[in-house]
C-alpha cells in the first residue's frame, strides 16, 4: 500500500527567481507527497552541496537539471518499490548511493526533495498531517516565531553588518496571538521608518532594509516600534539577532564595514555582551565566525548563561559538528535547516542530539524559499519550540506562518504555545 511506484522531479523557481528542485513521490495506493527544496544566500562552508548545472547560458549557471535527472533516474531506480514508511532506509540508501561526505555527487537538493516528499506521501497514505506522522501523539507545541523585520548583511544592500534583527513574541498566549503581535509591530515599524525618511522596500526574507549606520540604530527603531504598537519590550516581546559573523570575519578579525570598525575576537564577544546588557536580546545566532572555535568558546563562557547562542554556520545541522560543539562548550543552541544536511533522518537526529545535551533547537527556513511549508510541520513534530521563517511579508514566508495557524486550530485545546519556556534564559 505504501510502496513507492513513482518519483517525479522538476525544476521550479524559488522566491529569488532562481531554479530549485521539486519532487513528487507517488505510492501504490495513489497517495502523493510533494516537497520543494529551499536555498541559502549566506551558506556555511561545511553545508551539504546544492548541485547546480553551471551552464552560464541557462539560468546564469544556476539551473538544477542535473539534480532533477538524478531524481527521475538514479534515485527512482534505487527507491522504486521501497516502502515509504521506511524513512531511515530510504535516506540511508540515497546517502550510500551518493557516496560522498557532503552529498556532492547527486546533490543535497535532489536527495532532500525525495526524502521530504517520501515522508509526506507516507503521511498522506495514513491520512495524517505531517507533524503527527513524524512527531507522534506528543507533537502539540507551537513554536515561538523569530520574525526578521530588519535586514542587513548579505540579505540587504545597506551598511548594517548584522544580517537579521528579529522580534520574538514570547508573552503571547497562543501562536495566533504571537503572529498578530508580530504583524502589528511590523506595520508600526514600517510607519516609523517611513516617517524618518527611510526606504520601506523589503528584502529576501520580507524584512525592511533601511539605510541605517549600525546595529544600535536598527535596534532602537525596533524597540520604538514595539512600544508604539502597544507591547512591552523585555516582557511581551524579546529581541534576537543573526550576526552571520562569518560574512565579515577577515584575517582573524571582525571587520564592520558599515561602522568602519574592526573588532578582535575578544572585542566581538564583549560587543555582543554589551548589546545584551542594553537591549532585551535573548538569542544571538552566529555571533562568531564558523571556524573561530576559540571565539565561540569565549562568547559562550561570557554570555551563554543569559542568552541563547545559536550555531548555524557553526553546526550546519550536522551531528558530527554538533557533538564537537557540545563536548567543547561552544554555543547552546542549534539552527535546524533541512537543506544543510539533506535528509529528514539526519535533520531529526540533529534535533534529538541537541535536546539530549540540553541545547535548544530552532527550525529554520532559507533566504531562497518556496510556498512549501514543511518546516512548519517539522517545528511542531520535533517540539523544538522555536521557528525562524522570515518576516510578515512575502507569501514564501507567510506560507509557514499560515500552516502553523492551521495546525494550532486543528490541535484545538491540545495546542500549547511554547512562549517564554522555549528560551532557557526566560524560564
Swiss-Prot record:
Mg(2+) binds at residues 242, 285, 312. It is found in: Cytoplasm; Secreted; Cell surface. InterPro entries: Enolase, Enolase-like_C_sf, Enolase-like_N, Enolase_C, Enolase_CS, Enolase_N. Its cofactor is Mg(2+). Binds a second Mg(2+) ion via substrate during catalysis. Its main location: cytoplasm. GO terms for cellular component: cell surface; extracellular region; phosphopyruvate hydratase complex. (2R)-2-phosphoglycerate binds at residues 163, 337, 366-367, 388. Its EC number is 4.2.1.11. It catalyses: (2R)-2-phosphoglycerate = phosphoenolpyruvate + H2O. Pathway: Carbohydrate degradation; glycolysis; pyruvate from D-glyceraldehyde 3-phosphate: step 4/5. Signal peptide: none annotated. It comes from the Bacteria. SUPFAM superfamilies: Enolase C-terminal domain-like, Enolase N-terminal domain-like. It is an enzyme of class 4 (lyase). Keywords: Cytoplasm, Glycolysis, Lyase, Magnesium, Metal-binding, Secreted. GO terms for molecular function: magnesium ion binding; phosphopyruvate hydratase activity. PANTHER family: ENOLASE. Belongs to the enolase family. Catalyzes the reversible conversion of 2-phosphoglycerate (2-PG) into phosphoenolpyruvate (PEP). It is essential for the degradation of carbohydrates via glycolysis. This is Enolase. It comes from Rhodopseudomonas palustris (strain TIE-1). The gene is eno.
Amino acid at each position: 500500500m505504501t510502496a513507492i511506484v513513482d518519483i517525479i522531479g522538476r525544476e521550479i523557481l524559488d522566491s529569488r527567481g532562481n531554479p530549485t528542485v521539486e519532487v513528487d513521490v507517488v505510492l501504490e495506493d495513489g497517495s502523493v507527497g510533494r516537497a520543494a527544496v529551499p536555498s541559502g544566500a549566506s551558506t556555511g562552508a561545511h553545508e551539504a552541496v546544492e548541485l547546480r548545472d553551471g551552464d552560464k547560458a541557462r539560468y546564469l549557471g544556476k539551473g538544477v537539471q542535473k539534480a532533477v535527472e538524478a531524481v527521475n533516474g538514479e534515485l527512482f531506480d534505487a527507491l522504486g518499490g521501497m516502502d515509504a514508511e521506511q524513512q531511515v532506509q530510504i535516506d540511508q540508501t540515497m546517502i550510500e548511493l551518493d557516496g560522498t561526505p557532503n552529498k556532492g555527487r547527486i546533490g543535497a537538493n535532489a536527495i532532500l526533495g525525495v526524502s521530504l516528499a517520501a515522508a509526506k506521501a507516507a503521511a498522506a497514505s495514513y491520512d495524517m498531517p505531517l507533524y503527527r506522522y513524524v512527531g507522534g501523539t506528543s507533537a502539540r507545541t507551537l513554536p515561538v516565531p523569530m520574525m526578521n523585520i530588519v535586514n542587513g548583511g548579505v540579505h540587504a544592500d545597506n551598511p548594517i553588518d548584522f544580517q537579521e534583527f528579529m522580534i520574538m513574541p514570547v508573552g503571547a498566549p497562543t501562536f495566533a496571538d504571537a503572529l498578530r503581535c508580530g504583524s502589528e509591530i511590523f506595520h508600526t515599524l514600517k510607519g516609523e521608518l517611513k516617517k524618518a525618511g527611510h526606504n520601506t522596500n523589503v528584502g529576501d526574507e520580507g524584512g525592511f532594509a533601511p539605510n541605517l549606520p549600525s546595529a544600535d540604530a536598527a535596534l532602537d527603531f525596533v524597540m520604538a516600534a514595539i512600544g508604539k504598537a502597544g507591547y512591552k519590550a523585555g516582557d511581551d516581546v524579546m529581541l534576537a539577532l543573526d550576526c552571520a559573523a562569518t560574512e565579515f570575519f577577515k584575517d582573524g578579525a571582525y571587520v564592520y564595514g558599515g561602522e568602519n570598525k574592526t573588532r578582535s575576537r575578544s572585542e566581538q564577544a564583549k560587543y555582543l555582551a554589551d548589546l545584551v546588557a542594553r537591549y532585551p536580546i535573548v538569542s544571538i545566532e552566529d555571533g562568531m565566525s564558523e571556524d573561530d572555535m576559540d571565539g565561540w568558546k569565549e562568547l559562550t563562557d561570557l554570555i551563554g548563561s543569559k542568552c541563547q547562542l545559536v550555531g548555524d554556520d557553526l553546526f550546519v545541522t550536522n551531528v558530527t559538528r554538533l557533538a564537537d560543539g557540545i563536548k567543547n562548550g561552544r554555543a547552546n543552541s542549534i539552527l535546524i535547516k533541512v537543506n544543510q544536511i539533506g535528509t529528514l533522518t539526519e535533520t531529526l537526529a540533529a534535533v534529538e542530539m541537541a535536546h539530549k545535551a540540553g541545547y535548544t533547537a530552532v527550525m529554520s527556513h532559507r533566504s531562497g524559499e518556496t510556498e512549501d511549508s514543511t518546516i512548519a510541520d517539522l517545528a511542531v513534530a520535533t517540539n523544538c519550540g522555536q521557528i525562524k521563517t522570515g518576516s510578515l511579508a512575502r507569501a514564501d514566508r507567510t506560507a509557514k506562518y499560515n500552516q502553523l495557524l492551521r495546525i494550532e486550530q486543528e490541535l484545538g485545546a491540545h495546542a500549547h504555545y511554547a512562549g517564554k519556556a522555549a528560551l532557557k534564559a526566560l524560564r
